[in-house]
Amino acid sequence: MESKIYTVSEVTGRITELLTSDSVLNDLWITGEISNFHHHNSGHMYFTIKDERSCIKSIMFRGYNRKLKFEPEDGLKVNAHGYVGVYKPRGDYQFYVDHLEPAGKGALYLAFEQLKEKLEKEGLFNEDHKKEIPLLPRKIGVVTSPTGAAIRDILSVVKRRFKNVSVLIVPSLVQGKKAAREIVEGIEYLNSRDDIDVIIVSRGGGSIEELWSFNEEVVARAIYNSRIPVISGVGHETDFTIADFVADLRAPTPSAAAELAISNRIELEKHLVNLYTRLYNSVSYQIKSYRDRLNSLSLKKVLTRPEELFIQKIQYVDELSRRLDWAMEGRLKDAREKFRVLSGKLDSLSPLKTIERGYSITLKGSEPINSITQVDIGDVIRSRLSDGIILSQVKRTMKEGEQDG
């Protein structure tokens, strides 16, 4: 009997049928560690899920991975749901993932830690960037739900502590998919106004899922970029969100946020009285100190007979004047002596001294003649003597040793 020969595509199709007909492989949870993770420009994620002995290539299409709250990475242990199929062009079997979650840690918790680490490295939590909360704001902007308990608590505290302070409420969702965007828009709107001195971003307590809007990166960056100081008052005292780390001041509750935003009127009055008392005591001490110094100086001899101070100074000036005269006289004497010596040396080197000893200087024009080659027959020359000048005309020149014939 002759064996049937199959094409590669036929074999691949048969394998695909076997896999798709297996109910276990069509609805499957796999646990393992991610390796070779790659987030493609198309938005699809490619990675391998492995354990100690085996591995399986996996893909998570963009439509599914957009729902992830965390970013998969190499070394992360995960639980993945999907089905096993075949990629026919290469004949590879692979795992098509439609749901992915960290093994052991919740996806939201992991996303929180990843974003916190990222923003901290960027410097969004740095203390030197945080703005000072004004002592007594004129108007407070509040981004929160207009119907929640948080806004009622805030308004109650404001009324009790300093009822003259104005509050502008910017309504916003505080949970759900659209909440983060509305919170950002509320912060940006308050920054566009000129009458807001401080912003409170707030909501009541809840689960991590309910508070998640305040862990979104867009909210964190809006708080960081706000030119107006921002106080976060999210959840209960034990709840922490990314917004708390970025805010200029973190309050454990909405009520506490309002208390931190404005001073109690009675406390402010006490503070002003305390400042006045400290200022009064400081000025009084300075006055007493200056009075004591003045009294002490009035007892000194120099102030009972102040003319003695001037007499001593006059004598000192006279003494300095005499010293200056002596110094100048000595310098002039030295200078005169140096001038006399130099004049003598200069005089001894003068050509006129040579003339006085019986010599003469012969010139052609203004140039001295020191060789017979400098003159021609018929030239008029001048001889300088000690008592005058002789004009001569050259009739003949003779070299050294030549006889007059």
UniProtKB/Swiss-Prot annotation:
Bidirectionally degrades single-stranded DNA into large acid-insoluble oligonucleotides, which are then degraded further into small acid-soluble oligonucleotides. HAMAP family: Exonuc_7_L. It catalyses: Exonucleolytic cleavage in either 5'- to 3'- or 3'- to 5'-direction to yield nucleoside 5'-phosphates. GO terms for biological process: DNA catabolic process. Its EC number is 3.1.11.6. Pfam families: Exonuc_VII_L, tRNA_anti_2. Belongs to the XseA family. GO terms for cellular component: cytoplasm; exodeoxyribonuclease VII complex. Keywords: Cytoplasm, Exonuclease, Hydrolase, Nuclease. The keyword Cytoplasm applies. It is an enzyme of class 3 (hydrolase). GO terms for molecular function: exodeoxyribonuclease VII activity; nucleic acid binding. Heterooligomer composed of large and small subunits. It comes from the Bacteria. InterPro entries: Exonuc_VII_L, Exonuc_VII_lsu_C, OB-fold_nuc-bd_dom. CDD domains: ExoVII_LU_OBF. It is found in: Cytoplasm. This is Exodeoxyribonuclease 7 large subunit.
